[in-house]
């Protein structure tokens, strides 16, 4: 097979490419220039598209004896990922830019270009597994190392995208094993630290970064009764479940801390309350997609058992789900959680599993609490 290896400049993508070469495939490496402006390239940053990352990717390809290219996807990345991130926060929602990038860039723009150029597949350093059922349908599963598993952020992939995707690290037991393999192979990135921040916010200060992009207007912080308990410098920078950064002039009657329960961007207010009010037992999701072929119960519109996960490394909880339609006739995923989840925010993604298999995902529109009404952004 002719395989395009996406090279981030990190240890995972380097070892993934090495394993693909070792498997006998014809491999070409490509580094994606994503968040840079034309004519610039950042240095000394923890984000993506640094000179160091590009150099590390080139060194890995040179060591493996494969061609290396840099493709500039910065304009599409800005439009589909960065601008979307800003718009979602401006609307009071909490987006997942990594999932958006996988959906629009790595497994859309990159994969489309790869196939157009005659490649059979794209391989990445994601910790996940693609499998085929007895009928030849492609499925997405968790990786062997659940601590590093990234199937959550790949839950947006379609059957056709899975068909052309390779995840060579699917059977890696630990990250330490991957680093040791990189060291044995003489790859210079063996000890390179992992990246944990949003790649286009290099200093990790999401709130400060958003303040430069969104018109932040001071407003009121209210408790669940509607009484003013503090002020904020901009409602758009908060997310449901947040505690830090709240300026509360009036302490709670019980003396316990309060958390963000709701963001009302039209009113420029933030609603806070006790931690127990963050517990949600019903999620309603829009923009539904299925990883591979939908399960039979979905087509029948009946309720099915699953595990629901709302954060990349969050704990999945047992649930029952079904698909219905909203008032406008659009598909709506309803997930009833057996065990409540804390701080479920509109804009986040709920991913459904059965065993290790990813069933699909939806963007959270509303979440209903055990003790309150619903959290919704209009």
Curated annotation (Swiss-Prot):
Signal peptide: none annotated. Disulfide bonds join 101-199. It catalyses: S-sulfanyl-L-cysteinyl-[protein] + uridine(34) in tRNA + AH2 + ATP = 2-thiouridine(34) in tRNA + L-cysteinyl-[protein] + A + AMP + diphosphate + H(+). The keyword Cytoplasm applies. It is found in: Cytoplasm. Its EC number is 2.8.1.13. Residues 148-150 are annotated as: Interaction with tRNA. Pfam families: tRNA_Me_trans (PF03054), tRNA_Me_trans_C (PF20258), tRNA_Me_trans_M (PF20259). Keywords: ATP-binding, Cytoplasm, Disulfide bond, Nucleotide-binding, RNA-binding, Transferase, tRNA processing, tRNA-binding. GO terms for molecular function: ATP binding; tRNA binding; tRNA-uridine 2-sulfurtransferase activity. InterPro entries: MnmA-like (IPR004506), MnmA-like_C (IPR046885), MnmA-like_central (IPR046884), MnmA-like_central_sf (IPR023382), Rossmann-like_a/b/a_fold (IPR014729). ATP binds at residues 6-13, 32, 125. Belongs to the MnmA/TRMU family. Catalyzes the 2-thiolation of uridine at the wobble position (U34) of tRNA, leading to the formation of s(2)U34. This is tRNA-specific 2-thiouridylase MnmA. It comes from Renibacterium salmoninarum (strain ATCC 33209 / DSM 20767 / JCM 11484 / NBRC 15589 / NCIMB 2235). The gene is mnmA.
